[in-house]
Amino acid sequence: MTAIIDIVGREILDSRGNPTVEVDVVLEDGSFGRAAVPSGASTGAHEAVELRDGGSRYLGKGVEKAVEVVNGKIFDAIAGMDAESQLLIDQTLIDLDGSANKGNLGANAILGVSLAVAKAAAQASGLPLYRYVGGTNAHVLPVPMMNIINGGAHADNPIDFQEFMILPVGATSIREAVRYGSEVFHTLKKRLKDAGHNTNVGDEGGFAPNLKNAQAALDFIMESIEKAGFKPGEDIALGLDCAATEFFKDGNYVYEGERKTRDPKAQAKYLAKLASDYSIVTIEDGMAEDDWEGWKYLTDLIGNKCQLVGDDLFVTNSARLRDGIRLGVANSILVKVNQIGSLSETLDAVETAHKAGYTAVMSHRSGETEDSTIADLAVATNCGQIKTGSLARSDRTAKYNQLIRIEEELGKQARYAGRSALKLL
């Protein structure tokens, strides 16, 4: 009854107005699953590869080739398979692709099918996706990392770091956490406006003011937290996504906005000082993706008191994560389903992290859709943390709204991760 009888891929638009892949899967009993694939702006060199069309259509970013793969090769390979055999289906697609980075079929084609299959199987079983994937123990609502000021590749301003985030660690529920975030977001908007800054929002819903450096951004956020009636570090902690690969040149970190250059040791010391001065509890990609020595130095310096998250470093890849674990590098992994390209491999990366004592953070991409799958996956894996943008733009709030629904559905079983999500707090 859960055999796959139809797969339909189509080209839709993401939140940046670029094409992406959406997939529908239909089972023999009529169960249905739909998934849309996200896309990143700052991408790691070791990520799985999207299949794009090239040429003039959509300025080369069309995905008709990927859609053709879904409707042709992939359908032929898995039609008739049991949708509940997720591992087997994902492995069939990986083998069919045959490359190390999913460059033949395209990670966007494979992932769309992988997620849609899981959703169809969940519907067939009469379970919500988080329960189908995570089992009876899926009950932890994640602390959101809310990106409220943007810089780097996500903005046209002098700030070199890509994201400045707030984490409502002192809230008692996801519903309350979202309220904390919203109140700080709107307070920050007013303070920026009063100071003469533009308050338009960027790709992830955060503000992109013309501030001179990271400290100026952090000062605005700290003041806004206090003005909104919260205590920095107690009610709401701070986080950074440096996206350091984007400004790593010839072995150094080149801060064009600040007109400063820092070698890896100076970079680590700079981050350590920021963490100490501003209640920063998590730093993502503080070092470049292939600067393993720099990562090791940073981890040795502050890894016992600050969550150090590998995004471009690990690219949701269990093999790269195991390298990091062996070298004692970082202490957390960012989990992006499209970096690795299948649900099974995503779950494997989270499991690998947890077994090694690393934390895991479920994450969106800067190019998103209304698809809220990652909210369910955050609860399914009990990872305790989620990155899904600011408190604006429906492509971001869709995930928060889904978490609120899940919390309501779980009732007394629900537990908000709070401070325990970051093992060092």
Swiss-Prot record:
MF term (GO), any: phosphopyruvate hydratase activity
Family annotation (InterPro entries): Enolase, Enolase-like_C_sf, Enolase-like_N, Enolase_C, Enolase_CS, Enolase_N
GO biological-process terms attached to the record: glycolytic process
Residues given in the record as (2R)-2-phosphoglycerate binding sites: Q162, K336, R365, S366, K387
GO CC annotation: cell surface; extracellular region; phosphopyruvate hydratase complex
EC id: 4.2.1.11
Protein purpose: Catalyzes the reversible conversion of 2-phosphoglycerate (2-PG) into phosphoenolpyruvate (PEP). It is essential for the degradation of carbohydrates via glycolysis.
Cofactor-binding details, from the entry: Binds a second Mg(2+) ion via substrate during catalysis.
Protein name as it appears in the record: Enolase
Top-level taxonomic group: Bacteria
Pfam families from the UniProt entry: Enolase_C, Enolase_N
Signal peptide extent: none
Binding of Mg(2+), residues: D241, E284, D311
Family per similarity comment: Belongs to the enolase family.
Major localisation: cytoplasm
Reactions the enzyme catalyzes: (2R)-2-phosphoglycerate = phosphoenolpyruvate + H2O
Xref: PANTHER family: ENOLASE (PTHR11902:SF1)
Compartments where found: Cytoplasm; Secreted; Cell surface
